[in-house]
Amino acid sequence: QVRPFLDVYQRSACQARETLVSILQEYPDEISDIFRPSCVAVLRCSGCCTDESLKCTPVGKHTVDMQIMRVNPRTQSSKMEVMKFTEHTACECRPRRKQGEPDGPKEKPR
């Protein structure tokens, strides 16, 4: 069965989609512990833009709190804790930055 063009086009468009992200990718400084689950489902922008010079980019974000189990492999102790993850709420096709171009204002280190 052939999927109609409009369906194919709409499904591939730039939009927030459920995406699995690794907790260690989001929290790289927490490598000494094990997390269960090791990844979480969050909404992130992805999809195709009408032009190769454009990139699917988040224009709206919010934070979600998720309950995760943290396991300390040295002591074999575990505890439930709330961790924060960024979800994308709105996406747009925006011009890609040229290599070497600054990313914009940098956050000040804490």
Curated annotation (Swiss-Prot):
Q: CDD domains this protein is in?
A: PDGF
Q: Which PROSITE patterns match?
A: PDGF_1, PDGF_2
Tissue specificity here reads:
Expressed by the venom gland.
Q: Which GO terms describe its cellular component?
A: extracellular space; membrane
Could you provide one GO biological process annotation from this protein's UniProt record? Answer: positive regulation of mast cell chemotaxis
Which keywords does the record carry?
Answer: Disulfide bond, Growth factor, Pyrrolidone carboxylic acid, Secreted, Toxin
Domain of life the protein comes from: Eukaryota
Which coarse location class applies to the principal site listed for this UniProt protein?
secreted
- Pyrrolidone carboxylic acid found at: 1
Q: Where in the cell is it found?
A: Secreted
Q: Name one Pfam family in it.
A: PDGF
Read off the InterPro entries from this record.
Cystine-knot_cytokine, PD_growth_factor_CS, PDGF/VEGF_dom, PDGF/VEGF_growth_factor
In alphabetical order, the GO MF annotations are: chemoattractant activity; growth factor activity; toxin activity; vascular endothelial growth factor receptor binding
Q: Would I find Secreted among this entry's keywords?
A: yes
Which cysteines pair up through disulfides? They are 14-56, 45-91, 49-93
**What job does the chain carry out?**
Snake venom VEGFs that may contribute to venom dispersion and prey subjugation by inducing vascular permeability and hypotension. This protein potently stimulates dermal human microvascular endothelial cell (dHMVEC) proliferation in a VEGFR-2 dependent manner. This stimulatory effect is correlated with activation of the MAPK Erk1/2 signaling pathway. It also appears to be a chemoattractant for migration of these cells and stimulates their radial migration in a collagen gel. In vivo, it induces angiogenesis in a Japanese quail assay.
Subunit record text: Homodimer; disulfide-linked.
Q: Which family does it belong to?
A: Belongs to the PDGF/VEGF growth factor family. Snake venom VEGF subfamily.
Protein name, UniProt field: Snake venom vascular endothelial growth factor toxin
Q: Native species of this protein? A: Daboia palaestinae (Palestine viper)
